From Swiss-Prot:
Residue ranges annotated for the RRM domain, each copy included: 7-88, 95-175, 377-455
Annotated GO CC locations: cytoplasm; nucleus; ribonucleoprotein complex
An annotated Gene Ontology molecular function: mRNA binding
Similarity section: Belongs to the CELF/BRUNOL family.
Alphabetical UniProt keywords: Cytoplasm, mRNA processing, Nucleus, Repeat, RNA-binding
Name assigned to this protein: CUGBP Elav-like family member 3-B
Length: 462
């Protein structure tokens, strides 16, 4: 029987030819083993050279760590074995809980009675506003981590209290480090610093990495399904465009894409739409990419609708910009829109620039306040996990195009997610790609519902 305070150990630097039965004699000399699992790649089944080990007694784990960690090198290995508490044990000293979705009428004493069956409580405080009104949440601090964990296991999501809009939330309170990271993310979002590199340092980076891995798998399947419309010449053109973007970005002229002309089945059995294009003679030589005509000319005075050459892919009509952009800004914008013109081909190679630098996307003050994209570019996402924030939803949808804004709706009283959000792209192509790939996408026990936002007024200008 495992003790309540038993420690889960991470074992590293073990030979890949050793499985559980081979490792057991090494570790059982320190005590009875509750669980020993070699870590394998979930897709290939290959041994990853490490394992998780849990003893029945906490004392056994401490003895094994003291005797083995960097003290012994197993046959065939260059470095000594690693024996240390797993990352999941790093919160072992946490005793303070955040309790959300309380009824407004519940007092400190009511909350204490709810939790006292799980152990001795040091602190219990319902959060209140300046006028003394409950905010619908509280902090509860137990004497031990085990008691706090037992309360989470028993109460989280178990009931909906009178006056609450959702089921009870019970989780460990954020550490000071996590609160600092959350504040940094909020500041970054307000400044428009939506860099996917910065998001890797978020409080939930491990969680979002798992989501990202699953997303990449689904996208790969989608690209394979759409490859019937992708001929070798289109692939070559996409690769050459990327090379040119890397070497000389200023040589590419931007063409903002505002709408998809048609969307057809990606099964490979339907007939690609007929393309109409401006005669080649009307396209200036400066727009050629190694002999491939990429984007037709545009007027900067009056909007016009012309077809972009897509070489066998679905056509993407383009509209000319209202105001003249500086060449460097045009260059960065142009690279993004080549991605839209050749989605499947471009996905096969690593993009040189994921998005233009913040300094290039500065807009007049009246445009900076605009948080929605043009009509047909805004999507709603339902059934999000409770712990998802703006950063997670942004990182999830960045692969589909340039995101103008990403927002998870939060209950003002409890500061808890309402489990739905809103994402705006700068072109309908990205929005439709996101809907096709992410609608029905499963995260844990949740299956996302992703759909296009319908404007309240179809004639509303953006």
């Amino acid at each position: 029987m495992k003790e309540p305070d038993a420690i889960k150990l991470f074992i590293g630097q073990i030979p890949r030819n050793l499985d559980e039965k081979d490792l057991k004699p090494i570790f059982e000399q320190f005590g009875k083993i509750y669980e020993l699992t070699v870590i394998k790649d979930k897709f290939t089944g290959m041994h990853k050279g490490c394992a998780f080990l849990t003893y029945c007694a906490r004392e056994s784990a401490l003895k094994a760590q003291s005797a083995l960690h960097e003290q012994k090198t197993l046959p065939g290995m260059n470095r000594p074995i690693q024996v240390k508490p797993a990352d999941s044990e790093s919160r072992g000293e946490d005793r303070k809980l955040f309790v959300g979705m309380l009824g407004k009428q519940q007092t400190d004493e009511d909350v204490r009675r709810m939790f006292e069956t799980f152990g001795n409580i040091d602190e219990c405080t319902v959060l209140r506003g300046p006028d003394g009104t409950s905010k619908g949440c509280a902090f509860v601090k137990f004497q031990t981590h085990t008691e706090a964990q037992a309360a989470i296991n028993a109460l989280h999501g178990s009931r909906t209290l009178p006056g609450a809009s959702s089921s009870l939330v019970v989780k460990f309170a954020d550490t000071e480090k996590e609160r600092g990271l959350r504040r940094m993310q909020q500041v970054a979002n307000q400044l428009g610093m939506f860099s996917p590199i910065a998001l890797q340092f978020g409080a939930y980076s491990a969680y979002t990495q798992a989501v990202s891995d699953q997303l990449m798998q689904q996208q790969a399947a989608l690209v394979a399904a759409q490859s019937a419309y992708l001929n070798p010449m289109a692939t070559m053109a996409a690769v050459q465009m990327q090379q040119m973007a890397t070497i000389n970005p200023n040589g590419i002229i931007a063409t903002p894409i505002t709408q998809i002309n048609s969307i057809t089945s990606s099964s490979g059995t339907s007939t690609p739409p007929t393309l109409t294009a401006t005669p080649v003679s009307a396209i200036p030589a400066t727009l050629g990419v190694n002999g491939y005509s990429a984007v037709p000319t545009q007027s900067t005075v009056q909007p016009s609708s012309e077809a972009i050459y897509t070489n066998g892919l679905h056509p993407y009509p383009a509209q000319s910009p209202v105001a003249q952009l500086d060449p460097l800004q045009q260059a960065y914008a142009g690279m993004q829109h080549y991605t839209a013109a050749y989605p499947a081909a471009y996905g096969l190679v690593s993009p040189a620039f994921t998005q233009p630098p913040a300094i290039l996307t500065q807009q007049p003050p009246q445009q900076q306040q605009q948080r929605e994209g043009p009509e047909g570019c805004n999507i709603f996402i339902y059934h999000l996990p409770q712990e998802f924030t703006d950063s997670e939803i942004l990182q999830m949808f960045l692969p589909f195009g340039n995101v103008i804004s990403a927002k998870v709706f939060v209950d003002r009283a409890t500061n808890q997610s309402k489990c739905f959000g809103f994402v705006s792209f700068d072109n309908p192509g990205s929005a439709q790609a996101a809907i096709q790939s992410m609608n029905g996408f499963q995260i844990g026990m949740k299956r996302l519902k992703v759909q296009l936002k319908r404007p309240k007024d179809a004639n509303r200008p953006y």
